Amino acid sequence: VLTEESAEVLRTTVGMVSGHADAITAAFYRRLLAAHPPLRQVFNQGSQATGEQARALAAAVVGFAGHLLRTPGPAQPGQPGQAFNGVLRRIAHRHASLGVRPDQYPVVGQHLLAAIGEVLGEAVTPRVHRAWDEMFWLFATALIAEEARIYQRGGSNPANPWRSWRVTARTVTTPEVLSLDLVPAGIDPLPDYLPGQYVSVAVDLPDVGRQARQYSLSRAPGAGSLRITVRRVPATGDAPAGAVSSHLHNRVAVGDLLDLSAPTGHVTLAPGADPLVLISAGIGTAPMIAMLGHTARLRPGRTVVVAHADRSPAHHPLRTEMLDLAALLRDVRLHTWYEADTPPAKGAPADDPGPGAGATRAAGPAAASGSGSDRPAPGRAVACEIRHRGRIDVDALPLPDGARVYLCGPPPFMRDVRAGLLRRGVPEARIRYEVFGSDPWAGAPT
């Protein structure tokens, strides 16, 4: 329980810690990784290079401290309160996908408190140190409890979270996006998972060592295999190219083995008959395809709105599969936004890249892998697609009453869309989102 004395200290020092958060987290990672080099395998070295991981840690720690100060009554370990639950669950699921263990938390706490002392100097009195140590252990205890539940549900062992999987198919869906189908390499059964969940994929890289990244499962359960859909992350001004995504694109072939975690992730398709609104951008379409496929198979009468934004139809991953699955639904509205789009000619199929404008028609029924031509085969069912030019416009989206909304895409995209949804009156509790990589949006509710 956070004591009254510690709450008072946190109140007077949280602004100071927040103001020096970048320096504190940089010192933390420097200290931690120098003392425990094997932990480099747990952390995304690309995000380390850009500082994104440090910013995410700072947002989570300061966000939890702020949450404790806003929560009335005593804070109970393992019961962080509704406002922070989504953030905590997201972090715990990410940790579970990497095999984070309870015995690693004391090391983290030691170096985090040492980093606070290094940066803030004499301002960190014994009283201040005790308060932040207390806050850290409330956070750690809540994470450990949630991670234990995840390991138990998934039947996984944090001491050995990886299982070997064999690549059975490799499909290039756009010039930058690759889908890999996988089956267990040994006698392990195919794990159960929920639409919207992801796996960590671990690979051994020259000069870097073992690195893991998270990839959504992009096919609904029940297919007899898992599928991940991977965007090749290009180098930018301040960030190197994605090491793991480049390895998967350049080096992995059918028949190769990959190490995968058990499926995790808390942003999953809600059961029931409430209308669904699935909004994505870029590779964020991957979990939406799993949700769409699951709904088409089990609840084809459910009201569904699908909205996707991309650079162009040619850059839209799994576009054909999205169109095919939408055609299996009886009450679906499908909107796409393309920044560089030449809509189809009048009377042409939706995936025809020729000139034209307006509402268009899309193909179905569902393609199993999203491979093949984007033109519909003769005689297949069609679903109406409304295609727009430019960036997504939340005001143009149909929003059924009582809908559950799911977002996945770059954090700036989701921040803007979420703000637009709130402005239109969608309750915050009905908006869920997934972020991959180090999460710079860690302090926002889900």
Question: Where on the chain are the PLM-derived regions?
Answer:
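Globin-like tetrapyrrole-binding proteins
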Residues: V1-W162
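Ferredoxin-reductase
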Residues: G155-L257, A296, D310-S312, L323, ...
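Short, conserved phosphate/pyrophosphate- and ester-handling motifs at nucleotide-, phospho-/glycolipid
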Residues: G196, G284, P410
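Short, Lys/Arg- and Gly-enriched loop/turn segments at beta-strand edges
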Residues: D207-S216, G265-G272, V277
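Phosphate-binding glycine-rich loops and their immediate beta-loop-alpha structural context
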Residues: T268, V277-R299
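Structural motif
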Residues: P275-V277, V305, R404
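Reductase modules of NAD(P)H-dependent flavoproteins
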Residues: A307-T446
